[in-house]
Amino acid sequence: MRFFLDSANIDEIREANRLGVISGVTTNPSLIAKEGRNFREVVQEIAAIVDGPISAEVISTDAEGMIAEARELAKIHPNIVIKIPLCAAGLSATARLAQEGIRTNVTLIFSANQGLLAANAGATYVSPFVGRLDDIGHDGMDVLRELVEIFDIHGIATEIIAASIRHPVHVSAAARAGAPIATVPFKVLMQLVKHPLTDLGIERFLKDWESVKDK
């Protein structure tokens, strides 16, 4: 399973990229708004740091508006993937953009049926929101597992991005479910790196080394 970073914070993206474990970045209007910077500038800067897919989301609610935005975003950098919400207009826009060779990441997916529709429209990626489903008492991993199974049965090339990841358990569960990609917040990525026994082991090794290095 590959990792994307779900962030628009340049410092976080730089630090995560230095680890050598992220293959792409996902953003959304909320994440970019938190940075208080120009949208295009942020996306350009991310593209200069990470050599992989960078999802940038449209804000229009009609198909024609989404398509127009997508065409402009796609001009920023070859790695830009257009993030489009799952709705009737979004499906229409996705189908048109696929015909033009513009890659898409259909987001805000909460059922396997929605993911299947997006794939049929020509989406490059689909992003089921695991954590938000958990928030309303559903099992987000059940939806993810169902979607993975359906795509496998039918040989669907669209890649699944496990999204709305809240904690490390979501990550390992997504990997077990067969998701090819998980997009994780910086905080969760750092939680994956750390383990108290690892820290204790390093401390013990250093202590043992100090006791013998001058002998």
Curated annotation (Swiss-Prot):
Pathway: Carbohydrate degradation; pentose phosphate pathway; D-glyceraldehyde 3-phosphate and beta-D-fructose 6-phosphate from D-ribose 5-phosphate and D-xylulose 5-phosphate (non-oxidative stage): step 2/3. The active site is at K83. It holds the Pfam family TAL_FSA. The keyword Cytoplasm applies. It catalyses: D-sedoheptulose 7-phosphate + D-glyceraldehyde 3-phosphate = D-erythrose 4-phosphate + beta-D-fructose 6-phosphate. Keywords: Cytoplasm, Pentose shunt, Schiff base, Transferase. GO terms for biological process: carbohydrate metabolic process; pentose-phosphate shunt. Gene3D superfamilies: Aldolase class I (3.20.20.70). It is an enzyme of class 2 (transferase). SUPFAM superfamilies: Aldolase (SSF51569). InterPro entries: Aldolase_TIM, TAL/FSA, Transaldolase_3B, Transaldolase_3B/F6P_aldolase, Transaldolase_AS, TSA/FSA_arc/bac. Its main location: cytoplasm. GO terms for cellular component: cytoplasm. Its EC number is 2.2.1.2. The keyword 4Fe-4S does not apply. PROSITE patterns: TRANSALDOLASE_1 (PS01054). It is found in: Cytoplasm. One of its GO terms (molecular function) is aldehyde-lyase activity. Belongs to the transaldolase family. Type 3B subfamily. PANTHER family: TRANSALDOLASE (PTHR10683:SF36). Transaldolase is important for the balance of metabolites in the pentose-phosphate pathway. This is Probable transaldolase. The gene is tal.
